[in-house]
């Protein structure tokens, strides 16, 4: 692993993610920069802090798309999770690791309360217009809830597209009898939380450019 995560930090900061959020994840041992390819590696750990899951994201975009891959042997039950700093009864769930960091950054600026933040390891939704099959309960969320009986609220932070709305609806139906469900999708159609963080980071730049004219 790279000793300073310099390239990964630069890549993620350019996408609107705060240095404080990144430093916290590195301190927790759930984010590092791989060598020699300098991928961002997101780690999921079990109850004994043993790494059981890893997701790799390339920092060099080719044709607008970066390399993304779950490490072979990863167990989705132990997907990437940023723990709450203190006792907390809410877990927020996301489609992707970067969405976790992006939403943390946005809420940090607003002074929102602390919560557990869990990546689901992606979702498997039907294509829009196809038959509406049911969704299995996410392994990562099922395992998390089994390990923390104090949780009473699930905040669904999936993407605001067909697949994300489909997943949100099915998670709500699966858990609303036992948990309070909060639906918190990005306000812009088609966006994920990573998109929202990028837009928020660009807004001050646009304002400064206008003022300089």
What would you call each of these model-derived segments?
Residues 1-77, 82-85:
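Basic, glycine-enriched DNA-binding surface that flanks or lies within the catalytic cores of DNA
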Residues 12, 42, 49, 95, ...:
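Terminal peptide-recognition signature
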Residues 36-38, 85-88, 97, 150:
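Short, well-ordered loop/turn elements at secondary-structure boundaries
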Residues 40, 100-107:
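Contiguous, well-ordered alpha-helical segments that form the cores/surfaces of helical PPI scaffolds
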Residues 60-61, 98-100, 123-126:
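Short, catalytically relevant binding-site loops at active-site mouths
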Residues 88-89, 105-213:
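TOPRIM fold recognition
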Residues 95-98, 160:
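Helix N-cap/beta->alpha junction signal
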């Amino acid at each position: 692993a790279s000793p300073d995560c310099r390239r990964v930090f630069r890549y993620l900061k350019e996408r609107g993610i705060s240095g404080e959020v990144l430093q916290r994840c590195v301190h927790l041992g759930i984010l590092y920069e791989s060598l020699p390819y300098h991928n961002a590696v997101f780690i999921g750990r079990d109850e004994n802090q043993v790494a059981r899951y890893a997701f790799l994201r390339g920092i060099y975009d080719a044709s607008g798309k970066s390399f993304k891959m779950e490490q072979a042997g990863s167990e989705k039950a132990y997907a990437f999770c940023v723990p709450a700093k203190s006792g907390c009864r809410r877990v927020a769930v996301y489609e992707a690791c970067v969405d976790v960091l992006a939403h943390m950054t946005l809420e940090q600026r607003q002074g929102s309360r602390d919560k557990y933040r869990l990546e689901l390891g992606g979702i498997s939704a039907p294509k829009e217009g196809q038959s509406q099959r049911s969704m299995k309960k996410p392994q990562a969320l099922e395992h998390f809830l089994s390990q923390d009986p104090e949780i009473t609220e699930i905040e669904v932070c999936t993407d605001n597209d067909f697949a994300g709305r489909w997943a949100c609806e099915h998670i709500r139906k699966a858990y609303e009898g036992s948990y309070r469900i909060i639906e918190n999708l990005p306000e812009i159609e088609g966006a994920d939380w990573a998109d929202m963080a990028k837009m928020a980071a660009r807004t001050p730049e646009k304002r400064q450019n206008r003022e300089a004219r």
